[in-house]
């Protein structure tokens, strides 16, 4: 089946050669330590040396691309109870993470650029913790994103992820940018790379699904943006959910059923 939202094969995933990025291990959830040394997380000795920078926050983990100044991917678990909480994004603005020992974008890079500050780990998934909410507003979790996409189909997909967490009890979620031919160039003094597209990969028990959306005013039907995790892995060169047993991973990632996701 043709899927109109799938971009052409990228040169590499957010600038990381695909042959290397396949080695990345899936991070565990909610590790408070997030210091990095020599480009490798102190809390993740099993992370491949090909990994650029891994930063662990209270609610999510980010693989950060210091060359492009955007994430390679973010990953977290979302449970049904975490879809609601007392903490709001009100009054929060993006800023640099003072604890991250990596070069980061600045607010001036985005100002008057024509691109929105797009969360990869959405603030709405972290209402259960004040600290986790604040940490979603670091530039280590941000990409230049088309505002119509940010407030439209991408926002709809983020809301559906919360619906699926309530339905299935728990999800593992990966989100990130895809850099193709860098058609949109860079923004700001620091030359923050503008992605060509964005992806989500979602695992719920014994089923999975993935989505890709171009970084423009994307009005494509959600079903047309869906694909198997295997297809997304072929597109990005990333091995999602690598902590799963190979036979289980291969079976679950090979197919997807839109009806299981209410699509």
Task: Outline where the language-model segments fall.
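N-terminal module-boundary/linker segments of secreted carbohydrate-active enzymes
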Residues: 2-71, 78, 246-263
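N-terminal start-of-chain detector that recognizes signal peptides
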Residues: 15-16, 23-37, 44-50, 88-95, ...
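Context-gated lysine
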Residues: 22, 30, 42, 49-52, ...
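Short, charge-rich amphipathic segments
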Residues: 39, 74-88, 156-167
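Short, His- and charge-rich active-site/binding loops that engage polyanionic ligands
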Residues: 55-117
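Domain-level detector of nuclease and nuclease-like folds
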Residues: 98-263
């Amino acid at each position: 089946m043709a899927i109109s939202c799938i971009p052409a094969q990228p040169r590499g995933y957010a600038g990381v050669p695909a042959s290397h990025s396949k080695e990345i291990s899936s991070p565990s959830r909610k590790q408070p330590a997030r210091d990095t040394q020599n480009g490798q997380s102190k809390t993740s000795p099993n992370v491949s040396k090909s990994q650029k920078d891994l930063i662990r926050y209270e609610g999510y983990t980010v693989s950060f691309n210091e060359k492009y100044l955007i994430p390679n991917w973010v990953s977290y678990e979302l449970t049904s109870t975490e879809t609601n909480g007392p903490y709001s994004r009100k009054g929060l603005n993006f800023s640099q993470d003072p604890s991250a020992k990596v070069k980061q974008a600045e607010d001036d890079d985005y100002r008057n650029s024509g691109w929105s500050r797009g969360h990869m780990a959405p603030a709405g998934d972290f209402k259960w913790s004040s600290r986790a909410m604040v940490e979603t507003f670091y530039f280590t979790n941000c990409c230049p994103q088309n505002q119509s996409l940010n407030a439209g189909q991408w926002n709809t997909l983020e809301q559906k992820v919360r619906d699926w967490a309530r339905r299935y009890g728990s999800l593992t979620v990966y989100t990130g940018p895809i850099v193709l031919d860098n058609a949109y160039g860079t923004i700001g003094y620091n030359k923050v790379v503008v992605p060509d597209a964005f992806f989500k990969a979602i695992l719920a028990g014994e089923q999975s699904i993935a989505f890709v959306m171009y970084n423009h005013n994307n009005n494509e039907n959600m079903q047309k943006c869906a694909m198997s995790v295997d297809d997304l892995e072929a597109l990005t060169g990333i091995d999602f959910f690598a902590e799963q047993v190979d036979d289980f991973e291969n079976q679950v990632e090979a197919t997807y059923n839109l009806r299981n996701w209410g699509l």
